[in-house]
Amino acid sequence: MTNTPKSHPLIKIMNHSFIDLPAPSNISAWWNFGSLLGLCLGLQILTGLFLAMHYTADTTTAFSSVTHICRDVNYGWLIRYMHANGASMFFIFLYLHIGRGIYYGSYTFTNTWNIGVLLLFAVMATAFMGYVLPWGQMSFWGATVITNLLSAIPYIGPTLVEWIWGGFSVDKATLTRFFAFHFILPFIITAMVMIHLLFLHETGSNNPSGVNSDSDKIPFHPYYTIKDVLGILFMMITLMSLVMFTPDLLGDPDNYTPANPLNTPPHIKPEWYFLFAYAILRSIPNKLGGVLALVFSILILTLFPILHSSKQRSMSFRPLSQCLMWMLVANLLILTWIGGQPVEHPFITIGQLASVTYFFTILILMPSTALMENKLLKW
């Protein structure tokens, strides 16, 4: 009799990826976020599918179709708020997952890391387009402001913006295409996730010590499946608490006002998970400079494998680098706060200082500190 999990072409892949996968024996809860992100993606696709059944991508009916989902569709309010807050959970886990990668030096798996950065861009694009769909005030003006940034690209900029809009302003054509892209991108993301895992399973997982763990592996199932279930439990408790008690906590009240091209909201700002990048964009008084800083604030992640100058992989045994890491986290929290504030004194100055500190820490302080630690250890 053949052993199906090990011989069947499809089941064999699943078996090697989630059951018999050799995993380091010492990976902590920081390694839970991969599975949580996978669950978030599945949840978003599922809730999104049910929302798409009732949503209409037309400027005249989009806003009222969302209202209809919340009021008239069975458990429509639940599906809508699970989708909206699920996106917030998605980004929380993404940022923690990336932070873990930086702290423990997981970026030395360059293929896995670079696909991860592309995934981040894809998820950010999807979330941005999803925010436009309810066609509230912040949807409309957010779409106008962010797409308009592309006009800063020399020579082709203005033409490119009109091409994306499908006209001379954000209108019906824009909404329709954003819905189409918002629907297709999660499936592209799913394919990219598979590539991300394929590259990861070529090398095996990193671990908190940063030392090769080939000599000490345990099967993924049951050890890490049960550990993942605990993470999933915590995630669902947090998500459902948000959805049931404060569904609008992370949203913008302006988005409950239907889109009006003749009335600009006093403070145009994106969802909370983009505020750090928005603060960096706003801190540069030049349009093209701001756009470049915005893009580079994410693209800088691809430089981590190049900038790694320590003889140790992980930060576990490097106290000075740990201080810088937490300084970077604090800096990003300050940027997030500034991104939600109006453009006036003292927020402008704080934003500019935090933006400079962000790039300075990653590009200069972290690599030079790592070199100093090598010297201190006589390496």
Curated annotation (Swiss-Prot):
Family annotation (CDD domains): cytochrome_b_C, Cytochrome_b_N
First-listed, main subcellular location of the protein, grouped into a coarse class: mitochondrion
SUPFAM superfamilies per UniProt: a domain/subunit of cytochrome bc1 complex (Ubiquinol-cytochrome c reductase) (SSF81648), Transmembrane di-heme cytochromes (SSF81342)
InterPro entries: Cyt_b/b6_C (IPR005798), Cyt_b/b6_C_sf (IPR036150), Cyt_b/b6_N (IPR005797), Cytb/b6-like_sf (IPR027387), Cytochrome_b (IPR030689), Cytochrome_b_C_euk/bac (IPR048260), Cytochrome_b_N_euk/bac (IPR048259), Di-haem_cyt_TM (IPR016174)
Entry annotated with the keyword Transit peptide: no
BP-aspect Gene Ontology terms: mitochondrial electron transport, ubiquinol to cytochrome c
Cofactor binding summary note: Binds 2 heme b groups non-covalently.
A GO cellular component entry from the record: mitochondrial inner membrane
Annotated signal peptide: none
Binding-site positions, a ubiquinone: H201
Binding positions for heme b b566 per the UniProt entry: H97, H196
Family (UniProt): Belongs to the cytochrome b family.
Subunit structure: The cytochrome bc1 complex contains 11 subunits: 3 respiratory subunits (MT-CYB, CYC1 and UQCRFS1), 2 core proteins (UQCRC1 and UQCRC2) and 6 low-molecular weight proteins (UQCRH/QCR6, UQCRB/QCR7, UQCRQ/QCR8, UQCR10/QCR9, UQCR11/QCR10 and a cleavage product of UQCRFS1). This cytochrome bc1 complex then forms a dimer.
Note in the entry: Heme 1 (or BL or b562) is low-potential and absorbs at about 562 nm, and heme 2 (or BH or b566) is high-potential and absorbs at about 566 nm.
Protein name as annotated: Cytochrome b
Protein's organism: Ctenomys argentinus (Argentine tuco-tuco)
